A protein has these predicted regions:
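Single, function-defining residue in the core of a domain
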Residues: 1-106, 114-121, 126-456
Length: 456
């Protein structure tokens, strides 16, 4: 879908929202369209008229407009889009949203070791189709706030039942996802980091026949042999090496490294006498003992080198959920900059922007992904948009065919004053959207100039 066709996108995502009145649904679609068109800007700055501004604020203040109803429409749209893909990765991760605005902070909970910080905890699940490198959409998202009175009382949390702990979020996400996807769930592989290495969660996934790849955090006991899980690599089946692209993060530079893969079936046991868990264990590590090492647990059967490498490739895609949270929180949708008067109003906007952020991520990812960067840029830019961008950035005669997505992504970033100082070829969120806004100003100027050719 062309990026500037925001209304079609918004109608596809939110057009089925059940808000008790069709006029509210239409207003939601209009608001989402404006927020997508001017990603990162406020309601006032993104709306096209004062009537739109007033309508948007009435919608956000309406107690009959439930955040879950807004999200439900988006999840339904994602489930509908998922039906056409033979394999899907459910990329999961948690984050916190930090809101410093004084009017709403008292309704929020603690989020960090800083007792003054206030916000929401969030657990998100993105569906991604690895076969075509396509971002399908957001299929699940939970929001909650920690009680301020429980700050610093970790020992009390350990005594709670599993269903009342934050760690239950992983199983809860799988339950919700299975309800929404139905038969499609059998094509889904959940991909989670070390926080999901929870006995109850692994047991649940296996008992429900759900597929997963989880990075192990705990050096668990083995049922069929003495010793523990992390001492197994010397006795595993070798599966060759794999080139891993380590993305730039914080002060860590982007790099490529050779990872050596080995695998075997394992049975993990618990000291309490519960039945062991039968899984496949894959070890992926650098030759340097101090280098990176992934201990992966999966429900998938691995019988050869190709299958082992495929599992490692699935886990590599997990970083996309971290990129999604960046697109949502800071560089793209800038959800943490919201200034709403109540928590309910805040959650309505947070929910809408959660889906806008998926759209932001999909644009950047298609432009930098090796699988899609050579596709035509007309999948995201209209002919007028890419031609104006070409004239502005290249200053040459227009090519006979549209340039690739990689060119479009980098050209938008350069228009936003991006300089590839780290030599990664991966522009950040802010420069892409600065470039996008400048391009839209160019398009508007071009159309106004064209209109002068008509009689007034």
């Amino acid at each position: 879908m062309v990026l500037s066709d925001c209304y079609s996108w918004a109608n596809d995502i939110f057009g089925s929202a059940e808000l008790g009145d069709l006029r509210r649904t239409r207003r939601l679609v209009t608001l989402a369209s404006s927020l997508a068109q001017y990603t990162g800007l406020s309601i006032v700055k993104s709306s096209r008229s004062s009537a739109e501004v007033e309508g948007a604020y009435r919608l956000m203040r309406n107690p009959a407009v439930l955040p879950d109803a807004i999200a439900g429409a988006g999840f339904t749209a994602t489930a509908r889009a998922a039906a056409e893909h033979p394999l899907l990765l459910a990329l999961e991760d948690s984050t916190s949203l930090n809101f410093s605005h004084s009017t709403v902070r008292e309704e929020l909970g603690s989020i960090t070791n800083n007792q003054r910080a206030r916000g929401l905890q969030v657990h998100s699940v993105l569906l991604y189709a690895p076969g075509c490198a396509h971002m399908v959409g957001l299929i699940e998202q939970q929001r909650w706030s920690r009680e301020y009175d429980s700050y610093g009382k970790k020992h009390q949390r350990k005594q709670r039942p599993y269903e009342e702990k934050e760690s239950y979020k992983w199983q809860k996400a799988s339950e919700h996802m299975a309800q929404r996807l139905g038969e499609i769930q059998s094509r889904v592989i959940s991909v989670c980091d070390r926080e999901a290495d929870i006995w109850h969660y692994l047991d649940y996934k296996l008992s429900q026949g759900q597929r997963f790849v989880v990075r192990a955090a705990q050096n668990r006991l083995l049922a069929e042999a003495p010793g523990k899980l992390f001492s197994l690599p010397e006795h595993l089946t070798e599966a060759g090496s794999h080139t891993l692209n380590v993305v730039q993060k914080g002060g860590r530079a982007a790099r490529q490294t050779q990872m050596f893969i080995s695998y075997n079936n394992v049975q993990l046991k618990k000291t309490t006498g519960e039945a062991p868990l039968s899984l496949t264990y894959i070890c992926c590590r650098e030759a340097d003992p101090e280098g990176a090492c992934w201990h992966l647990l999966t429900s998938e059967k691995v019988e050869n080198t190709e299958q082992a490498r495929a599992i490692v490739g699935y886990y590599e895609r997990r970083w996309l959920i971290e990129e999604y949270h960046k697109a949502w929180k800071s560089g793209g949708a800038q959800v943490e900059q919201l200034r709403m008067q109540t928590r309910d109003n805040l959650e309505r906007m947070v929910t809408i922007l959660a889906f806008v952020a998926v759209r932001v991520l999909a644009l950047r990812q298609r432009g930098v992904s090796e699988e899609t960067q050579n596709e035509s840029c007309e999948s995201v830019l209209s002919p007028v948009e890419w031609k104006l961008l070409w004239v502005k950035q290249e200053g040459k005669t227009l090519p006979e065919s549209p340039p690739p997505l990689k060119w479009a992504c980098q050209s938008l970033a350069k228009l936003g004053r991006w300089y590839d100082s780290k030599r990664t070829g991966r522009p950040g969120w802010i420069v892409i959207w600065d470039g996008w806004f400048k391009l839209q100003d160019m398009v508007e100027g071009y159309r106004m100039a064209k209109s002068l050719d008509q009689e007034i």
